[in-house]
Every structure is written in structure tokens, then in C-alpha cells.
């Protein structure tokens, strides 16, 4: 079987390629060129020129073919432009989930299958993919819960699942690092990438500001009861649930409740005002057909590494899904992905509204 591995030049994807080769697969490496940014050594992003060099070194070390695909224009159109437009609307987008659908996983899996003749596409994500007796092919949380990345796959098209392999599904990060060291893989000591890959270590607001991608306008910070309590320095600097850095004096701590792009205001309130009994999402993507969903025991996640929140019911109108919490929970940020789970099984996801 011919398996293409998405190689980022990091430890995880390098070990994924190694493990597949050790199992006897016909392995090829594929690396995307998504950015021309050259970062300093203390900033780890992905898909940069240095990462391509690292991926080439690893592929050569493993003795596998390696291809570089220049999708910088596609990445700009599908991910960066989306990121900017969502911030213009006052939202807090999750570009990594969109990227996995539009570029790094969904699109690339189809590309290597059609163009390079690969039967399967593998990545170094900490995710499981299994056959379920009721749901069919499903994505599940990885064994290393601290590193689980299933949340970022919530927007994937269902027909891609049959192409995917995740060799690190049952491993921990520590075990993967140990394998890399034992096999003397050239990037075994490389640091992890934690940032949004195209911001080069900057916060989203800093990236938007420094690249003149968005006009930052100061506006009012308004208490949920209607009183103006301060000034904000631009909506991208704030997100729902934020408490620190508001610059507002009040009799008790205030939190960001909402960002109103039309009025250019940040709405704040006490913690109890942050609580809600539901969350809604649009353009919901069903990885498991909704008619197969269980009626109870489901949970939702509204950002990466957030603890799953139990829900008691869901309602669906067209492409809009609303989940109702078992008890009041803090609001989720608009623009993030709402992922729905049955235990460890990812049922689908949509964009929070």
C-alpha cells in the first residue's frame, strides 16, 4: 500500500513516516510550502522554508521520496483571508480547523490520492480513526489526551475519512520524542510549534496590525446594563470570556460578554452575565449522520484544549445546530468551532454564532 505522509519538518510527522516505513508501507513524504516567512530560531511555526529543509532532511534520512507542493496562494485565499474577514466581523476565528479542511488534511488527502497515487494519507496528529458498528468510519480523541487534536478535524468532509491514517494515535508525545531520539531522526530535538503558523509568533492582533490587514479603531467598552465604562483599543485585542487587560475599574471583576462589530463596542459584565444555557453554530458539518446520534451523553467543545461540556439536547434548523447545556456555562467565542462528541467520538462541528 502506498501511503503519503504530510511532513511538516517536525518530530511528530517524521516519526509517523518512520513508523509506516517500519511496517512495510510504500511511504512518500509530502510537504506544503505555505509561507515565505523566515523566522528566528526561537520561534517555531510550520510550513516555512526552514521546515521544508527539515522535512527534506528527514525524508532523505528515511530513504523515502519527498515532494514539495506550493500552495501559498491557496493558503492565503482559504485561510488567511478567512482569518482577516472573521476578525473584521468582530469574531475570534479558528484558522487551524479551516486549514485542515481546506488545505493541510482534506484537500491534501485528495490531492495525493489523485495526483500521486497514494492509497492513504497520514499525518502526525494525535488522533484515532476507527470503524464504529453504528457510526461507520469515525475520528476519535487520541490516547494522549493532553495532545489530542481531534477538535481541529471537526470541519473535515466525511468522504475524506476513508483516506486517513494517524500512526501516532496510541502514543504519547513523550513516547514519540523517544522514538525520534532512538532512531536518531535529524529533527528529534526540534521544538514544538504552538502558534498560528502564519503569524510568526505574534498574537492575532499584532499580526493584523503589523501587516495592515485590518483598521483598528478605538471604541467604547460598555457594561451589559448600558453604561460606558472605558475605551478599547480595537476589537481584535479582545475575546469573549477575557478578564485581564480591559483597563476598566469596577466594583467586581468584569469579563468580555460580546464584541459588537457594527457599533465597534466591547460589551462587558460580571461573571454571572457570561453564563448561558446554550450555544449555536452555523454551517454544521456532520461527520456522523445526525439520525445516528445518541439522544443523551453528548458533549461539546468550543476551543482547543477546553474541557468537554455536557449537553442535554440539540436542535437543528437547516445548517444551524444549537446545543443546550446541562447547566449554565460560560459563553463560547463567536467564530470558534463548536465540536460535538459522543464520548471520544467526534460527531461533527460548525462555526459558533
Swiss-Prot record:
InterPro entries assigned? MnmA-like, MnmA-like_C, MnmA-like_central, MnmA-like_central_sf, Rossmann-like_a/b/a_fold
Q: Where does ATP bind?
A: 6-13, 32, 124
Q: Which GO terms describe its cellular component?
A: cytoplasm
Cross-referenced Pfam families = tRNA_Me_trans (PF03054), tRNA_Me_trans_C (PF20258), tRNA_Me_trans_M (PF20259)
Role noted for this protein:
Catalyzes the 2-thiolation of uridine at the wobble position (U34) of tRNA, leading to the formation of s(2)U34.
Record field: catalytic activity: S-sulfanyl-L-cysteinyl-[protein] + uridine(34) in tRNA + AH2 + ATP = 2-thiouridine(34) in tRNA + L-cysteinyl-[protein] + A + AMP + diphosphate + H(+)
The active site consists of 99 (nucleophile), 197 (cysteine persulfide intermediate)
Question: Which GO molecular function annotation, any one, does this entry have?
Answer: ATP binding
The residue range of the signal peptide is: none
What protein does this entry describe? Answer: tRNA-specific 2-thiouridylase MnmA
> What keywords appear on the UniProt entry?
ATP-binding, Cytoplasm, Disulfide bond, Nucleotide-binding, RNA-binding, Transferase, tRNA processing, tRNA-binding
Q: Which NCBIfam families match?
A: PRK00143.1, trmU
Single GO biological process annotation from the record: tRNA wobble position uridine thiolation
- Residues annotated as region Interaction with tRNA? 147-149, 303-304
Compartment(s): Cytoplasm
For this protein, the Enzyme Commission number is 2.8.1.13
- Tell me its family: Belongs to the MnmA/TRMU family.
